[in-house]
Regions:
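Conserved ATP-binding/catalytic motifs of P-loop helicase motor domains
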Residues: 1-333
Length: 333
């Protein structure tokens, strides 16, 4: 099945189409995971454009929420930052009206959501909808994310002590709302599968499905190396190949040559490299100042880009979001 979103045509694979029908035609809770490039974001976008259900899309951070044209979890549910535990959840009439209108709640980057916040979402929906005995107040919950890529912020202090006393771990799947154990119906960490997670006394269940077809890479050897890194099974040969190709200082570009992109582990290293190359360009520096609206949670640290963007003629620009223009489309990255 294909969909034309502006100038960009999206066609679902068979496994994506099967999952779309599951979340569209049923009220089952679904967790969709998969390696980078398997189409999680594509499926989420397709569902948002095609569903006949009343949905709300949210994510744990401002950047993640912006990417899916949603809200942060804390903004949607009006939850306080930090440990929520058993504290009273205050809800205005406006918040209750919003939460009562939702048929399906979509959460992106679910792996960054901790167990305490997952339970707070459950309690908020039960409370707002007046259905305290039904998980999520009867709302279908569809979650996208990959625990192998992003983890919750590790708890500290009182929050750590609370998590240790009340949960098996701080991961979302150890929240009280998801109790019981995985009961496999086929599938494994390396293949596709539809698994079920029992929900304790309420008898509901979570479908866990892993997308397995990688659309972003076509080189089988490279994909095998990426999988080895992902699962912690790097052999000496793989390590040597990766170190030979990647763990080296790139040469300085020749005059007029475009610099090689450098991947770094910290923002300060990246910013230093970019500032050095920008300063080397001739011409006057121009500053574009952001117009900020909406809730980004914790201020500038959660902005998708700097509030002041410094540019010169000849500077390279990387798109953080796809731009669908009249003349065609420009892709993020």
């Amino acid at each position: 099945m294909a969909l034309n979103m502006g100038c960009v045509s999206v066609t679902l694979s068979d496994e994506q189409q099967t999952l779309f029908r599951l979340i569209e035609d049923t009220d089952e809770h679904v967790f969709i995971t998969g390696r980078a490039g398997t189409g999680k974001s594509t499926l989420l976008q397709y569902f948002a454009w095609n569903t006949e259900k009343q949905i709300a899309i949210c994510a744990p951070t401002g950047v993640a929420a912006l990417n899916v044209e949603g809200q942060t979890i804390h903004s949607l549910f009006r939850l306080p930052i930090g440990l929520i535990a058993e504290s009273q959840i205050e809800q205005s009439d406006a918040t209750r009206r919003v939460l009562n209108a939702i048929q399906t709640l979509v959460i992106d980057e679910i792996s960054m959501v901790n167990a305490d916040l997952m339970d707070a979402i459950d309690r908020s929906l039960r409370q707002a909808r007046g259905k305290r005995g039904i998980p999520f107040g009867g709302v279908q919950v569809v979650m996208f994310g990959d625990p192998y890529q992003l983890a919750p912020v590790p708890p500290r202090g009182d929050e750590l002590r609370y998590v240790q006393d009340h949960y098996r771990s701080f991961w979302f799947f150890d929240a009280k709302v998801w109790t019981g154990g995985l009961q496999g119906q086929g599938g494994s960490s390396g293949g596709s599968g539809d698994q079920l997670l029992d929900l304790g006394e309420y008898g509901t269940r979570l479908h866990v499905h892993e997308l397995v077809h990688i659309h972003r890479q076509s080189d089988d050897g490279f994909k095998a190396m990426l999988n080895a890194v992902r699962y912690g099974r790097v052999t000496a040969d793989i390590a040597e190949t990766l170190n030979t190709q990647g763990a080296r200082t790139p040469p300085e570009p020749e005059p007029g040559e475009v610099p090689i992109i450098t991947l770094a582990t910290r923002n300060d290293i990246v910013n230093s490299i970019n500032s050095r190359h920008l300063a080397a360009l001739a011409g006057r520096e121009q500053i574009a100042r952001a117009e900020v609206s909406g809730d980004f949670g914790r201020g500038e640290a959660n902005y998708p880009a700097d509030s002041e963007l410094k540019l010169k003629v000849g500077a390279q620009v990387m798109f953080l979001r796809n731009d669908i223009a009249m003349q065609g489309s420009r892709r993020a990255g």
